[in-house]
């Protein structure tokens, strides 16, 4: 196998997106389009990967980091001009170069690997990735000769009646002999209506020099979808969503309603987990086996242990242990660590808190900037008062603590192991171990007060 290189074209402005966001950074199933392409291309055993950037170059470089080298196309003068920007990095290399657009998020490593192998086995100087479609209007047609090699690529507007009947189309993805590619780029002319340098002209140049130009036809036309506007973006989203859901179901995950379930491409879900409708799983979330998620639940960049149930709730950037029950209508905010066999009930919000094994907050509580021990019971309406208008303060609750209903813990404060806090208390000082703390006004009953008040009003 020869050395392999790839050039990703990601310099276009994307005017038809009508967006402030650079086109290739628009997400599909939670991941930028160009990141999808890079993730797949990176599986091909490349020696070098070059991404050609233009508009929004800094943001694309920030997204991709050091997985790619970058070449700048400061002025967009066509696809051949874009590839030529990578000359300083690749022109002297021996091997095969894949050229692909950064707005094709559905392309898979398997299809690109098949294209590369076909190219190498055919002994071609260039190979075009093609597809067969029943309605090819608007696409460039592949005209083959009697040997099955590519004779030319004809744009729809330039095709004659015979060529218009061809249903094999150019997808815009190519393989080239690297040296032949960069030698040909210098020969491409911009003598056309747009005054731009087009990559398909390299095919004509190589063909004219007597080189073999081959074509590899993929069975998966959907993979070649280029996203140029919001309509195509939504189409890519649906296709990717279905692909991700199918993969999870094949791997043993039950998805009750795949059409109403949204799972990130980077999410990992264990077998025998059930996903209910309206669930959104984002980022690099990891969910264990035998879990029940949803309905109407959002989980982002979090780790969920085996056997955990999360209903009608939101979990962000947190870790939840095994056999935990969350919801309905709970909110686990970033930097929270929930232990095993924990109960986080309805209308409970937890933020930046370590919540120990076996502890419970079953209803109507806010727990923020806290450290909760094991086997703690937080009664209905328990609140950690963590903010004084300027700074956040920590609440520490030891093991086996019982907090009565409607209690306020004014941080910084510590309730030591085994202590009890009476219902309705506002705790402003530390509570010793095993102590009962009562911090509320003493009840006063005024006998016959109501009758006296009403008689007084009548008189």
From Swiss-Prot:
Positions bound to Mg(2+): 103, 228
CDD domains membership: GT2_GlmU_N_bac, LbH_GlmU_C
Region (N-acetyltransferase): 252-459
Gene Ontology cellular component terms for the protein in this record: cytoplasm; membrane
InterPro entries to which the protein is assigned, alphabetical: Bifunctional_GlmU, GlmU-like, GlmU_C_LbH, Hexapep, Hexapep_transf_CS, NTP_transferase_dom, Nucleotide-diphossugar_trans, Trimer_LpxA-like_sf
A matching Pfam family: NTP_transferase
Region annotated Linker, chain positions: 231-251
Cofactor note: Binds 1 Mg(2+) ion per subunit.
Annotated positions binding acetyl-CoA: 386-387, 423, 440
One function term, GO molecular function aspect: glucosamine-1-phosphate N-acetyltransferase activity
Pathway stated in the Swiss-Prot or TrEMBL entry: Nucleotide-sugar biosynthesis; UDP-N-acetyl-alpha-D-glucosamine biosynthesis; N-acetyl-alpha-D-glucosamine 1-phosphate from alpha-D-glucosamine 6-phosphate (route II): step 2/2; Nucleotide-sugar biosynthesis; UDP-N-acetyl-alpha-D-glucosamine biosynthesis; UDP-N-acetyl-alpha-D-glucosamine from N-acetyl-alpha-D-glucosamine 1-phosphate: step 1/1; Bacterial outer membrane biogenesis; LPS lipid A biosynthesis
Described function: Catalyzes the last two sequential reactions in the de novo biosynthetic pathway for UDP-N-acetylglucosamine (UDP-GlcNAc). The C-terminal domain catalyzes the transfer of acetyl group from acetyl coenzyme A to glucosamine-1-phosphate (GlcN-1-P) to produce N-acetylglucosamine-1-phosphate (GlcNAc-1-P), which is converted into UDP-GlcNAc by the transfer of uridine 5-monophosphate (from uridine 5-triphosphate), a reaction catalyzed by the N-terminal domain.
Protein name: Bifunctional protein GlmU
Annotated source species: Bacillus cytotoxicus (strain DSM 22905 / CIP 110041 / 391-98 / NVH 391-98)
Gene it is expressed from: glmU
């Amino acid at each position: 196998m020869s050395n392999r290189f790839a050039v990703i074209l990601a310099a276009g402005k994307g005017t038809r997106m009508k967006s402030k966001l650079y086109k290739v950074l628009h997400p599909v199933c939670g991941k930028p389009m160009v990141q999808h392409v890079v993730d797949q291309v990176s599986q091909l055993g490349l020696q070098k990967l070059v991404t050609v950037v233009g508009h929004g170059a800094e943001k694309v470089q920030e997204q991709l980091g050091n997985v790619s080298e970058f070449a700048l196309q400061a002025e967009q003068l066509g696809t051949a001009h874009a590839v030529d920007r990578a000359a300083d990095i690749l022109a002297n290399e021996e091997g095969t170069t894949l050229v692909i657009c950064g707005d094709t998020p559905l392309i898979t490593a398997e299809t690109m690997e098949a294209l590369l192998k076909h190219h190498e086995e055919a002994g071609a100087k260039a190979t075009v990735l093609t597809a067969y479609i029943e309605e090819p209007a608007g696409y460039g047609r592949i005209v083959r000769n009697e040997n099955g090699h590519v004779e030319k690529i004809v744009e729809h507007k330039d095709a004659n009646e015979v060529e218009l009947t061809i249903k094999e189309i150019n997808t815009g993805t190519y393989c080239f002999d690297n040296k032949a590619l960069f030698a040909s780029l210098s020969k491409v002319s911009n003598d056309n209506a747009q005054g731009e340098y087009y990559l398909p002209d390299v095919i004509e140049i190589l063909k004219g020099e007597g080189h073999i130009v081959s074509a590899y036809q993929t069975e998966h036309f959907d993979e070649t979808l280029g996203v140029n506007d919001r309509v195509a973006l939504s189409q890519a989203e649906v296709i990717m969503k279905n692909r991700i859901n199918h993969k999870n179901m094949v791997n043993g995950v039950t998805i009750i309603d795949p059409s109403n379930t949204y799972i990130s491409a980077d999410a990992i879900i264990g077998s025998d987990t059930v996903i209910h409708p309206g669930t959104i799983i984002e980022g690099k979330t990891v969910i264990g086996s035998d879990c029940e998620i949803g309905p109407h639940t959002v989980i982002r960049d979090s780790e969920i242990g085996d056997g955990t149930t999360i209903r009608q709730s939101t979990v962000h950037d947190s870790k939840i242990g095994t056999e935990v029950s969350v919801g309905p209508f709970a909110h686990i905010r970033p930097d929270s660590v929930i232990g095993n066999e924990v109960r986080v009930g309805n209308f409970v919000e937890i933020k930046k808190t370590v919540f120990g094994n076996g502890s419970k907050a079953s209803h109507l509580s806010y727990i923020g900037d806290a450290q909760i021990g094991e086997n703690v019971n937080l009664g209905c309406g328990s609140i950690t008062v963590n903010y004084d208008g300027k700074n956040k303060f920590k609440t520490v609750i030891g093991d086996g603590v019982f907090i009565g209903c409607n209690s306020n813990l004014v941080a910084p404060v510590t309730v030591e192991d085994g202590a009890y806090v009476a219902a309705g208390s506002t705790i402003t000082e530390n509570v010793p171990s095993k102590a009962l703390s009562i911090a509320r006004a003493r009840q006063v009953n005024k006998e016959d007060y109501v009758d006296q008040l009403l008689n007084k009003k009548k008189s």
